[in-house]
Amino acid sequence: MDDVSFAHGPATIRLGDIEVPRIGYGAMRLPGKDVWGEPDDPAAARRLLRRVIELGIRFIDTAWYYGPLVSNRLIAEALHPYPNDLVIATKLGGKRLPDKSWAPAARPDELRQGCEHDLKTLRLERIDVVHLRHIASSGVPFGESLDALVAMRQEGKIRHIALSTVSRPEVELALARTPIVAVQNMFNVGGGGGPLARFTHSEVDRPESVLDFCTDRGIAYLPFFPLAVGNVAQVRPALAEVARKHGATPAQVALAWLLARSPAMLPIPGTSSVAHLDENWAARRIRLDSDDLRAIDGGAPGDPGARTQS
C-alpha cells in the first residue's frame, strides 16, 4: 500500500462508522463505450481494479446500471474476496433502457430489485453504502424512495444510507428521518456535467450550499464528474499554469482544488487507465497556496473555490 498522506486537510474521512482515505475510485469508466457492455479488454479492467487496492484506495463507487451489471461483475472478479477495509458504495434510483439511455427507477420495487442486483453481482450479503439517486422527473415522492432504503437497511441488506443529486432541503428532510453518511452531487472546478447532468434540477445546480451544509455536519461529500468532462484545462485555463508550477497535470490540480475546498470532500475520479489512476492518487500530495487558488478561481467573489481549507 502506498503512503496515505494528504497535503490538504485530513487523510481520511468518516462515513458513519467507516473510515477511508479521502480519494476513492469511481467505476463508471469500467464498462464499454457509453457505459454499456463489456470493455475492450476485461483483463486490463481487472488489473486496474487490483491496482486500486495496491495504491491504498479503499472506497469504490459503483452502480448495477453501469454496463448494466458490468462494473459490479468486474469488481467482484478482480477483488473478491474483498480486503476487510475496502468500502463498496452503490447507487439506486436509475436504470438503463435498451437504447442505452438513462432513466429513473425510484419506485420501492425498482429500488429493491436494484439492491438485489448489486448484492448478487458484487457477491455481498450487505452493501456498505447505498446512495439514493433522486431524479426529480421520476414522479416518485422522495420520502417514499427513502423509506424503501430504510426498510432494506433494517433487513440487513444496507449498512449506511447516502443521497445523490439532491438539494439542501432534501438532505435536511432525509436527516429528519434517518442518518445520512454521504451526499454525491456534481461538483468540479469547471462546473461541467455529463450524461447524467440532465437528471439534476435547479436546487442541485447550486452545489456550494449542499457542500457547505455537509461540511458543517460532518457528512462526506462525493463530487461526481470531479474532473468535469473532456479537457479540464480548457474548462479552466489557469489549471495548466498552476500545474506547471507544481510539476503536475491539470487534472491533478483539479483534484487538489477539490481536496482544498472542504475536509468533507471525497473525490471519486474514474478512469480505465492505470497511469491516470496513479496520477489521480498522487494528486493528494499537491499543496495549493493562496496564489494558486486565486488563479484557479479567477478571483471571483463567491466562487466556490474561494472558500478553501488548509
Language-model segments: which ranges?
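Short, acidic/polar
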Residues: 38-52, 106-122, 167-173, 206
